[in-house]
Structure formats: C-alpha cells, structure tokens
C-alpha cells in the first residue's frame, strides 16, 4: 500500500519538496541559509503579528504605543527585540545566501535567481517601512530622506513623492500606509518564496563543484532535515543572544527620541543592512545619478547570468575569480562602514572608490577573469 504522504493530494506536494526530494550528496553548510531564511520569515511574521495587536499607526501615539509594548504588555519587550534583531539576522542570512549563489554559480538557474532578486527588493522595502513605524527621530528623518529620493525622477518626481506621503510631508497618512504595507508584504513574500522553491525544484539544487549530480543524489529527509535543524538551533541561539544580551547594539540611539520635524539629527543613516547601498547613493554628487546608482547596486545582480564567461560554473576551482569574490565581499564591508560615517573627507573619496570598485568587479573584472581562466585551462 502506498504511504499516505505519497498519495494524499496535499501531503505529496510536501513530500516531493521536503522529504523524498533528490538532493546532491555533497552540498555544504552554505546551502543551509535558504531554510534559515524561511525560519526568519516565519519568526518575523509571528512576532510582527503580536506587535501589531498593540501598536497604533498614528503620529501622536505610535512612539508611546511602542513604549507601552515594552513596559506594560506581557513579554512585549522580548517580542519587540526579537522582531527588530530578527530583521538583522534575516539580512545576515540573506546576504550570505546571495554570496553563496554568486560563489558557486547558482545564478545560472535564471528563473530561481530572478525571483530571488524580487524577494530581496520586497524584503528591503518591507524592512525600510518597518523602521519608520516606531516614529522615533531616525524613523521620521529616514523616511523623509529616502522617500524624497523619488523627487529626482524627471517630470513626475514631486507628484510621486506627495502621492507616497499622502500629503505635503511625512505625516499620519504616511505612517498609516507604511504600517498597512509592512503588514501585508511578508505574506506576498511567502507566495513568492513558494514560486522561488518551485523553480528551484524544477532544476534541482546546484552543488559546490557546479557539476551535474543526477548520478549521486540522496533523499532530503533525514540527511538534510537534520542538517537544517542544526542550523536553525544555531540561528535561534544567535538571535536570543542578540535580543537578550545586547538588544540595542545594531539600533540607533536617536530612535529613542520621539520624531521631531523641527529638529534634524546630526547624521541621518538607515539600519546597518542598508548602509552599503546608502554609501553608493551618497558617493554620486548628482541626486538623480545617486538614485540610479542605488537602484543599479541591487538590479546589477540580474545581469550576472549574462556576464558569466567561465567554462566552470563554480568558483571552487577558479583562484582568480575567488580573489575577486573576496575583494567584492571586503568592498561591501567597506561601503557598510562608509555609510555609517559623516559626509566629509576622507569618507567621501573612500566611498566613491569603493562604489567604482563594486560595479567594476561585477561588470568587468569577473567576466574578464572568466575569459583568462578559460585560456589557462586550454
């Protein structure tokens, strides 16, 4: 008799995706981050749901409602810290996941890669809107500065900004719509993650060697479910350590002051996970140019399948490309540091050089390295 998990209409979908899924036998710990991202998304939705039960999206009461959650609601403080620090862990896993896909050439599964880029953009938009909700100083001014970037669009810019704001400045209407969007977007992310997984299971997983592994596959359960569970335990440990021992380490002290439109903070900056893009934005002296550079810093990932020139899929056996990959990693860390610094010498010039290097590595150096490596292995 066929097992129920193989015959039941719903269970057989789960079975084909998470139990009997044929998986390469040599995938490493770097392949854990997809499941960790799923765990992060579920955690964020659950903690966010409990926060939404007590939060009021109104400019007069938003800040005090956050204070009320932390002081008066049972375990409200830990729910808030898990949610805000969970976002940091989410982006840490997200950037590692993207880095692994670049290193091992998984971007050649273009449908999976493109849905992944869409997920990245939606995640960034959701996180930005979530940062506005506590209605502290950095929330208000961050929202003002970032939404103002749309005014750089020719002809429709000013109208577009006022349409986003729902008025002539960031106010109650803005906060209300940001809360509504911040609440609904994670559910669209679940749907898109389903599409992402469907595309992945059409081709099967890549592996560290970048070779076809059809002849050597093992079932996902129990081998990789145990492996993923260990990763999940480490993730939970990291999140609890961050939320319980140093909950404000990654936040901004200015956000403990209620939003004041008449008092601008000395240095307006977003959360750490947006600092690299913020540094690229600031490195271009022209407003429209900066906005385009900001957009391209993410959308450039979509060009990676087209820029792949090597005969080898993975970078595992390509030393020249490996050097460039780790240079790119350090360049992004440099941009993250620059984004947190004031706009003055020497940070301006370092930011400009790091931005040029970022685009040069992806658009020119990696494709050239691929051609050189092809020549060397002839």
UniProtKB/Swiss-Prot annotation:
Binds 2 heme b groups non-covalently. It holds the Pfam family Cytochrom_B_C. Its main location: mitochondrion. Heme b b562 binds at residues 83, 182. InterPro entries: Cyt_b/b6_C, Cyt_b/b6_C_sf, Cyt_b/b6_N, Cytb/b6-like_sf, Cytochrome_b, Cytochrome_b_C_euk/bac, Cytochrome_b_N_euk/bac, Di-haem_cyt_TM. One of its GO terms (biological process) is mitochondrial electron transport, ubiquinol to cytochrome c. Keywords: Electron transport, Heme, Iron, Membrane, Metal-binding, Mitochondrion, Mitochondrion inner membrane, Respiratory chain, Transmembrane, Transmembrane helix, Transport, Ubiquinone. PROSITE patterns: CYTB_CTER, CYTB_NTER. The cytochrome bc1 complex contains 11 subunits: 3 respiratory subunits (MT-CYB, CYC1 and UQCRFS1), 2 core proteins (UQCRC1 and UQCRC2) and 6 low-molecular weight proteins (UQCRH/QCR6, UQCRB/QCR7, UQCRQ/QCR8, UQCR10/QCR9, UQCR11/QCR10 and a cleavage product of UQCRFS1). This cytochrome bc1 complex then forms a dimer. Heme 1 (or BL or b562) is low-potential and absorbs at about 562 nm, and heme 2 (or BH or b566) is high-potential and absorbs at about 566 nm. This is Cytochrome b. It comes from Loxodonta africana. The gene is MT-CYB.
